[in-house]
A protein has these predicted regions:
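Beta-strand elements of well-folded, non-transmembrane domains
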Residues: 111-117, 178-180
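Core segments of small alpha/beta cavity-forming domains
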Residues: 23-94, 118
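C-terminal motif of bacterial Sec signal peptides marking the signal peptidase cleavage site
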Residues: 17-20
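Short beta-strand edge/turn micro-motifs at domain boundaries
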Residues: 127-147, 164-207
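Short, solvent-exposed mixed-charge patches
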Residues: 213-215
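A short hydrophobic beta-strand element
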Residues: 101-113
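Acidic, glycine-rich flexible loop segments
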Residues: 150-166
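Positively charged n-region of N-terminal signal peptides that target proteins for export
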Residues: 1-12
């Protein structure tokens, strides 16, 4: 009897192992956690394995890229800024659902990162002060637009690297799609906003405030 039970358990374990090997696909939860870790650590080689950007609207990214080229922002400057924004990123997976037949999955995650609202507030104060100081300088001594942009970038990076900054936690549904038989994160605006500590929400609120003030 014991041998029969043992044989059944071994057989079941073998079948499960073969099934797992046959799929050759990491779960949606595994991909989500590994993708978030790659983003936090700014692992540029690993990011394409977990993130799918094919369905994203890249118009804004294109405009930012053109602006970066105009002021000659280096890859090092950009990497330093991104890493400062994601260095405190942490997460807790709440649940995961997969629908391989439909090619979709959803992982509910509690994301924690820096709260960008107070950081943006500090940045605007310092940027305004710098701009005013520049405008008061004599002709020929005023910094160029490129120099001012570099200064703003450094100011924001320094603010993000402060210790003791506030954090915010947001629960979001992280969507994934099957790409060549593997799950990949296809972030929507809510996910991006949570990853960036509410930066998109803060920007929209600021834009609305400026529009109301100008009306």
């Amino acid at each position: 009897m014991k041998r029969t039970l043992l044989a059944l358990l071994v057989g079941l374990s073998l079948l499960l192992s073969l099934a797992a090997c046959g799929s050759g696909r990491a779960s949606a939860q595994e991909v989500t956690e590994q993708g978030l870790a790659a983003l936090r650590d700014l692992d540029v080689l690993a990011l394409p394995q977990y993130w799918n950007t094919d369905d994203l609207n890249l118009d804004d990214l294109g405009e930012l890229t053109q602006a970066g080229e105009e002021v000659d922002l280096s890859a090092e400057d950009t990497a330093a800024l991104v890493q400062a924004m994601t260095r405190h990123l942490s997460w807790q997976v709440i649940s995961a659902q997969e629908a391989p037949g439909a090619g979709t999955a959803s992982v509910t995650v509690s994301l924690t990162n820096l709260d960008m609202a107070p950081v943006v507030g500090q940045f605007l104060q310092e940027a305004f002060s710098d701009a005013l100081s520049s405008a008061l300088q004599a002709d020929g001594q005023q910094p160029t637009e490129e120099e001012m942009t570099q200064q703003y970038l450094q100011t924001l990076t320094d603010l993000l690297n402060q210790e003791g900054l506030d954090t915010r936690t947001t629960t979001v549904e992280v969507p994934l799609t099957l790409v060549d038989g593997q799950w990949k994160i296809t972030p929507d605006e809510a996910v991006v906003d949570a990853l960036l500590g509410g930066l998109l929400t803060t920007g929209e609120a600021l834009t609305s405030l400026l529009e109301e003030s100008a009306a």
